[in-house]
């Protein structure tokens, strides 16, 4: 690896550690030319999984899009940004597991995952998300969903 201090490509690894959940390796290195010590990180480069839209189109999973939808549902609710980040990470992890070998998941499955998480955290956010996700077209559908939540 190229030394950030002198640019030489000869170094030795002083120490290696596995980080996170085993998907990252931290290495302490020493340049053999100038003695400068630096840290490098190795990550597995994973292919993103695809989301199958209702009309059959496929597009890469977009974590920011999921996060924005959940934030919108939880807007002005007593839920921290850290909690939202954790929800998004949990849903993303579930989606990766559910996508299988072909690395594809339907939006309906993702939507149900979001509804499940929101239901356990904040019922108002659940109703907000459900009204958009389930495309309520009249007040009766909205009221019926509220009645289900109250049970």
UniProtKB/Swiss-Prot annotation:
Record-level Gene Ontology MF annotations: ATP binding; DNA binding; zinc ion binding
Keyword Repressor set for record: yes
Domain of life per record: Bacteria
An annotated GO BP: negative regulation of DNA-templated transcription
Cofactor(s) required, per the database record: Zn(2+)
InterPro entries named among the record's database cross-references: ATP-cone_dom, NrdR-like_N, RNR_NrdR-like
Cofactor, free-text remark: Binds 1 zinc ion.
Stretches assigned to the ATP-cone domain: 49-141
Keywords: ATP-binding, DNA-binding, Metal-binding, Nucleotide-binding, Repressor, Transcription, Transcription regulation, Zinc, Zinc-finger
Zinc finger (unnamed) residue numbers: 3-34
Keyword match Acetylation: no
HAMAP family referenced in this protein's UniProt entry, alphabetically: NrdR
Family: Belongs to the NrdR family.
Functional summary from the UniProt entry: Negatively regulates transcription of bacterial ribonucleotide reductase nrd genes and operons by binding to NrdR-boxes.
Protein name: Transcriptional repressor NrdR
Gene behind this protein: nrdR
């Amino acid at each position: 690896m190229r030394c950030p201090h002198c640019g030489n490509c000869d170094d030795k690894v002083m120490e290696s550690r596995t980080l996170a959940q085993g998907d990252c390796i931290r290495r302490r290195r020493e340049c053999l030319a100038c003695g400068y010590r630096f840290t490098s990180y190795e990550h597995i480069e994973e292919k993103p999984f695809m989301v199958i839209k209702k009309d059959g189109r496929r597009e890469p999973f977009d974590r920011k899009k999921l996060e924005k939808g959940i934030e919108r549902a939880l807007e002005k609710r007593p839920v921290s940004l850290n909690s939202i980040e954790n929800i998004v990470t949990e849903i993303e992890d579930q989606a990766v597991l559910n996508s299988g070998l072909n690395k594809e998941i339907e939006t309906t499955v993702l939507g149900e995952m979001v509804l499940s998480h929101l239901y356990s955290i904040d019922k108002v956010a659940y109703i907000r998300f459900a009204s958009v996700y389930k495309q309520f077209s009249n007040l009766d559908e909205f009221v019926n969903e509220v009645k289900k939540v109250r049970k």
